[in-house]
Amino acid sequence: MRKACSPAEPVFTHPEFDHETRIVSAIVAGVSVSSIYVPNGGKDFNAKIRFLEALIAHAHRCAAEGQPIVFCGDLNVAHREIDVHPKERKETVIGQLPEERALIGRLLAEGLVDVGRTLDPENDQLFTWWPPWRAMRQRNIGWRIDYVLASAAVAAKAVACAAYREVGTSDHAPVVAEI
């Protein structure tokens, strides 16, 4: 990957969030690859919504310019019901609210593909985050809020995408895609 990287100016900037360094990007073999950490919304739900709307606008610009992209990281939204363990499903909590899920839908409508879900569409155990109590991680009672989203042409080259639950350095599992 190092040989395929090239320096680039920031491709997604937002004055409200830049000081938090919520996005790190690089151009890899002509593809804009961004690691993203969406605000969880607990302290300022509207800031989360503004961030997601800005991300959608950025994806739209990239699509209009023909720039292939990969967004990976913590989006802090369980997009669909299958992305939350039945014991954790609560459509009234942040991370599962209909308006948040709709924004992820809008992001995908900009031509992005959910690589993990595409490669394993019916798996209801693809969780990437677990509440830090009652051995939730060990029992795999969690949420899928970490993703690899890619432009269709890039996603078509994906051969694998997995969450490594056994890596316990965080309350999230790293998600790795092989493209």
Residue ranges and their predicted role:
Residues 53-141, 145:
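Metal-dependent phosphoesterases centered on the DNase I-like endonuclease/exonuclease/phosphatase
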Residues 1-40:
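Structured beta-strand-rich core segments of catalytic domains in phosphoester-bond hydrolases
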Residues 130-131, 158-165:
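Short, solvent-exposed helix-loop connector elements
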Residues 13-14, 37-52, 88-92:
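Surface-exposed cleft-lining segments at the edges of enzyme active sites
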Residues 162-179:
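Surface polyanion/phosphate-binding segment centered on an Asp-His-Pro turn
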Residues 14-15, 137-140, 165-168:
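Short Gly/Pro-enriched turn/cap motifs at secondary-structure boundaries
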Residues 20-25, 144-146, 172-176:
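Short hydrophobic/aromatic beta-strand or adjacent loop that forms the aromatic wall/cage
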